[in-house]
């Protein structure tokens, strides 16, 4: 099971008493701010959760799996996530729920 933005909005509606519209907007604004910061080359640090970073990857040789032909994989920028120690500890000590 995956946590969705709709489920996050529903949680805010239930726990904080926000209207469904406001809860949805809050979730959207939160993620938009993370996107904006990353687009501007900024690191995103969420205390107790983890960091989103940008990493530049160089061009490298690759291979088309169907034809075996050598093809270059272009240089690109990727987003990476490094979980914080608190998140790591909680995940390591958690007991997963059966679906």
Swiss-Prot record:
Keywords, comma-separated and alphabetical: DNA recombination, DNA-binding, Transcription, Transcription regulation, Translation regulation
Residue runs in coiled coils: none
PROSITE patterns the record matches: HISTONE_LIKE (PS00045)
Key word Transcription present: yes
Biological process according to GO: DNA recombination; positive regulation of metabolic process; regulation of DNA-templated transcription; regulation of translation
Stored SUPFAM superfamilies: IHF-like DNA-binding proteins
Gene3D superfamilies tied to this protein: IHF-like DNA-binding proteins
Any Pfam family hit: Bac_DNA_binding
CDD domains the UniProt entry points to: IHF_A
GO cellular component terms, A-Z: cytosol
Gene Ontology molecular function: DNA binding; structural constituent of chromatin
InterPro entries: Hist_DNA-bd (IPR000119), Histone-like_DNA-bd_CS (IPR020816), IHF-like_DNA-bd_dom_sf (IPR010992), IHF_alpha (IPR005684)
UniProt keyword Transcription regulation present: yes
Physiological role: This protein is one of the two subunits of integration host factor, a specific DNA-binding protein that functions in genetic recombination as well as in transcriptional and translational control.
HAMAP family recorded: IHF_alpha
Protein family per UniProt: Belongs to the bacterial histone-like protein family.
Subunit-level organization: Heterodimer of an alpha and a beta chain.
Protein name stated in the entry: Integration host factor subunit alpha
Originating species: Enterobacter sp. (strain 638)
């Amino acid at each position: 099971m995956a946590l969705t933005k709709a489920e996050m909005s529903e949680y805010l509606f239930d726990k904080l008493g926000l209207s469904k519209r406001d809860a949805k907007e809050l979730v959207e604004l939160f993620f938009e701010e993370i996107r904006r910061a990353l687009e501007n080359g900024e690191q995103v640090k969420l205390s107790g959760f983890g960091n989103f970073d940008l990493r530049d990857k160089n061009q490298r040789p690759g291979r088309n799996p169907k034809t075996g032909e050598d093809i270059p994989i272009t240089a690109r920028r990727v987003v990476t996530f490094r979980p914080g120690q608190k998140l790591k500890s909680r995940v390591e000590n958690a007991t997963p729920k059966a679906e």
